Amino acid sequence: VLGIPGLFSTLGLRQTSDGMTVHGGEGTLDIVIRMLAGLWGAGRAPIAVEFAPLTAGQVIDAGDFTIDCFPVRHRDTDSFGFVFQSPARRRLRPHRLMALGVPDGPLRGELAAGRPIVLADRTVDPEDVLGPPSGGRKLVVIGDTETTEGLSQYVADADMLVIEATFLDRDAPTARNYGHLTAAEAASFAATNKVGQLVLTHMSGRYEDEEILAEAANIFPNTRIAADFDRIVL
């Protein structure tokens, strides 16, 4: 949230004509609106901006993937986690296309899109030539949260889980007081829900990253610490 004014300023200097929609809980949006108004005046942000309140269970269609929003508990804030999911796709099976005499070209595109085609001597249904679903990916991002209770339904079998790990387990009482998780809790949650990879964020400056990583990796080996400009392929 605190980085939004800087982002807006940069985009304004570039004289972008694109607008931006800020999604968030009511409390979060109120903070953003007041920050922007304090810097540039009410309704005078350097780029066009809209504000879209989030609700639990809301699904945003982003074209190639969907974003599912779910509530998480972090003190008295209206915080959310997010499931980014791309659909599994069914690919054409070349040997079936050849066996049924489907030529290269637009007809194969019709079948790939799930529509039957008519040849000179037969009708070919997509089910005749499509393979099983494959390739869908699931990324779950959870920021500040004081508990993972009730979140397994969103996280189970994710290819990647990005989640906070503010404290070490030796400071679990402090984590409870401030509404955060320990590295061990984050790792145990990942292991229980059979995620593919765990990426940790929001570590307290009182620890070295290596300490956080060691505690988590002891429970869930496929763990890494998030860093600016990371690129990770799911």
Annotate the PLM regions.
Residues 19-27, 162, 199-201:
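Short internal beta-strands
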Residues 1, 74, 202:
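Histidine-centered divalent metal-coordination motifs
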Residues 65-141, 145-154, 160-162:
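Active-site-proximal loop/helix segment associated with metal-binding centers of metalloenzymes
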